[in-house]
Amino acid sequence: MKKNKKVIFNGVFLVAVFALTIYGVFHGEDLESMMDAIRSADKRWLAPGLALVAFFIWGESIIIWYMMRSYGIKLKKRTCFLFSSVGFFFSCITPSASGGQPMQAYYMKKKNISIPVSAVILMIITITYKLVLVVVGIGVAVFGRGFLHQYLEGILPVFYLGLGLNIFCVTFMTILVFHPLLARSFLVWGLSILEKFRILRHKEGRLKKLEDSMDTYRDTAAYLKTHPRVIVNIIAITFVQRMAMFAVTWFVYKAFSLSGTGFWTVLFLQAVISVSVDMLPLPGGMGISETLFLTIFTPVFGTLLLPGMVLSRGLGYYGELLISALFTIVAQLTIGQGHGKDNKESYE
């Protein structure tokens, strides 16, 4: 019953945010002119943009495949692509992308991959994913002062908030991994405060769950210490993966035969949006992403700003949602129906 309520809440929340986004973005706009502009866009430039979205999903699957092999688990790359698709699909439709990794762990379990192994792999993917955003965000903040003042004056508070939240998240997860005793003390103290002020009801099993979660962080620390080269390679793959997704907007820009703004400027403007919205409790950053795009890309797209936003978000978010949804269905029909030895993977 509790699970059903959560599913219903997430569904209603997603529909509500989507409806408000559509209303906020398109209310009072000339939709006919916008559609004419979209139809006139050069599809030869949009096709590579869509390919980059697929590459983005594929990039995580390569990381999963690579880390599984470091554990001696031999998986087919197409299986890892299904794991990746499941993660991106449920991340797209749940607040703060909270549903992606639990569902990945569920499907990995269907392939007889233990929860401790999948938890470590998914933890490292999360840390490196956010670490790349932090590096890009700090790089823009420190070395792009002119860039900040030219394009980001109107959204600097949101950018710094997003960057700060990502830095906090990476720092906190690093403490959890490398200082589990300190992390345990902090979390126990936090739980006691929440229970004292009746924000959370006291539950006997909550501390036991906390202890179990600490095992994941200890295992992650052990992996990081014994596989430094693997971690460096994962960070490099993640960086390329993220840059590919940021570059989608440049292909939209070229599809309208626009010029005057360089590739790296467009890429880093899109990166700023990702840094700003990544930690916000909205499915896919819906609503705030569109607002930020319409603010910072005004000097780039000019009169084609709204159709540019529609195509950029259409490829970068809704394209990702569609591709990952299709392969999530495949995952359910192949992996999700498997049982026990029928789904057994090869171990070295």
Residue map of PLM features:
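Transmembrane helix-loop-helix hairpins in multi-pass inner-membrane proteins
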Residues: 1-32, 36, 90-202, 282, ...
